[in-house]
Amino acid sequence: MKISRQAYADMFGPTVGDRVRLADTDLWIEVERDFTVYGEEVKFGGGKVIRDGMGQSQLGAAQVVDTVITNALILDHWGVVKADVGLKDGRIQAIGKAGNPDIQPGVNIAIGAGTEVIAGEGMILTAGGIDTHIHFICPQQIEEALMSGVTTMIGGGTGPAAGTNATTCTSGPWHMARMLQAADAFPMNIGFTGKGNASLPLPLEEQVLAGAIGLKLHEDWGSTPAAIDNCLEVAERHDIQVAIHTDTLNESGFVETTLGAFKGRTIHTYHTEGAGGGHAPDIIKACGFANVLPSSTNPTRPFTRNTIDEHLDMLMVCHHLDPAIAEDVAFAESRIRRETIAAEDILHDLGAFSMISSDSQAMGRVGEVITRTWQTADKMKRQRGRLDGDGARNDNFRARRYIAKYTINPAITHGISHEVGSVEAGKWADLVLWRPAFFGVKPSLILKGGAIAASLMGDINGSIPTPQPVHYRPMFASYAGSRHATSLTFVSQAAFAAGVPQQLGLRKAIGVVSGCRGVQKTDLIHNGYLPTIEVDAQNYQVRADGQLLWCEPADVLPMAQRYFLF
């Protein structure tokens, strides 16, 4: 029996050789491999395959998966494949072929009466996003991020205090305890960073022992060489990550001074281009060092005709500056440079910048990490053409490079890749399903720990779930004990060993960070390029390995007005 490609795709989703457009971008992914078996595909519904004695076996709950996502198109750092995905006990059990092993060939995901079915036909499946630059200014950020496809948030803060409005620091053991307790309320994986600005170990170690999974150095607290050295020394002892916002004013030294203070030790440099803060005008040089793990924040992603104009006001508010004070205005203007922002686009496309995050409500938009990542990818394809690793008919390599920037690479950087960050067997089942036309913009279904935490949902009084108005709503995994079983609170090894989760009465599952200190930039997948960066101090032009980096700002972006009223 034969069936046309179009009919097959309509029924079971695309297969090998089919291409799928990502939203309204110029990015196309092509199916590289299909793990399902032609003629033996499983699908749920009236007259379909997943019925008793057909695609559903007689096996008990212990031998079948809890949930199967059928015929999904998986996009992850490791490839673009069509497969069924089996979930068991909150984790991804297997990727492959689902069905009834008694009568079907090649089944490695058994379906039984104890199995729920999520229809993945015609859908793109990705890992949940990881945002590692969160100012915990208000709890409502968490729902906004979740509805955008982000399932892990790392950062610091205590609410709308001046310190939190500017820095991602949960300062001190008392505040750390309160924030860890608050994290129980949310269907989101959460880890908190403490304040790293101190020149002696005690106040930093207290925060690590209280549960901090990392320490944040910020210029507003004084990112001096002494503070940097001490903070990294504490991190080395406790296997946690350090994030840094460097000294824009070059008061305690220049970029070379800060790089020297690192002493070759691993560090995550926030907004490494500099508009979000850092040595003016050349913090961007840091992306060329093996121990530096560089990220961007999303307001400069990508470079558009509006980017420069909006940044000045943002900066004045976020860093408690006064527009009536000339020195404050000069400080702000020193950070906003067309040339380095343009270079940032290209450095992402080359894989020299490795991650993208939000800088939520503090010069960044918590719900736009994923959208702005793909807007950057589209802009770069239109301006720079295909990448060397792409096929003649697809942008698979570029897609894998860019999705790694907000999934696996942040997970590796912050020591949580053993739990989250990719669609791989054994990992926490934090997964997002997208209709291709809405990919990267509006997810259809968000799973946390194998259960549905959020979804588009129609009129609650409708006779079916689809009538308008359709908007995002929390689902059952967002409530009560279910959220405790399906979301993680991350803590340091020291805090876990000391019994901090029990002492605080935490109810969520606990994840423990590890492997932070040995990470090198070359470990960051598809994003490990180490260029030699030069910045002209007079005109701010940027060169990488001698090549001038410049691109025009975009006048129009995809994933924008077609999808949003505002």
UniProtKB/Swiss-Prot annotation:
* Principal localisation: cytoplasm
Q: How is the cofactor bound?
A: Binds 2 nickel ions per subunit.
Q: In which pathway does it act?
A: Nitrogen metabolism; urea degradation; CO(2) and NH(3) from urea (urease route): step 1/1
- Output a single Gene Ontology CC term carried by this record: cytoplasm
Which EC main class describes this enzyme? hydrolase
Cell location = Cytoplasm
Q: Which UniProt keywords apply?
A: Cytoplasm, Hydrolase, Metal-binding, Nickel
Q: Which domain of life is it from?
A: Bacteria
Residues recorded as binding substrate, renumbered to this chain, are: H218
| Molecular function in Gene Ontology | nickel cation binding; urease activity
Report residues binding Ni(2+) 2.
K216, H245, H271
Modifications made to the protein after synthesis: Carboxylation allows a single lysine to coordinate two nickel ions.
Pfam families with a match to the protein in the record: Amidohydro_1, Urease_alpha
Matching InterPro entries: Amidohydro-rel, Metal-dep_hydrolase_composite, Metal_Hydrolase, Urease_alpha_N_dom, Urease_alpha_subunit, Urease_AS, Urease_asu, Urease_asu_c
Q: Which residues does the annotation say bind Ni(2+) 1? A: H133, H135, K216, D359
Q: Which residues carry this modification: N6-carboxylysine?
A: K216
Q: Name one GO biological process term.
A: urea catabolic process
- Active site per UniProt: H319 (proton donor)
Q: Needs which cofactor?
A: Ni cation
Q: What is the E.C. number? A: 3.5.1.5
Spell out the reaction equation it catalyses.
urea + 2 H2O + H(+) = hydrogencarbonate + 2 NH4(+)
**Assembly information from the UniProt record:** Heterotrimer of UreA (gamma), UreB (beta) and UreC (alpha) subunits. Three heterotrimers associate to form the active enzyme.
Describe the family membership recorded for this protein in Swiss-Prot or TrEMBL. Belongs to the metallo-dependent hydrolases superfamily. Urease alpha subunit family.
Write down what this protein is called. Answer: Urease subunit alpha
Species of provenance: Pseudomonas aeruginosa (strain ATCC 15692 / DSM 22644 / CIP 104116 / JCM 14847 / LMG 12228 / 1C / PRS 101 / PAO1)
Q: Which gene encodes it?
A: ureC
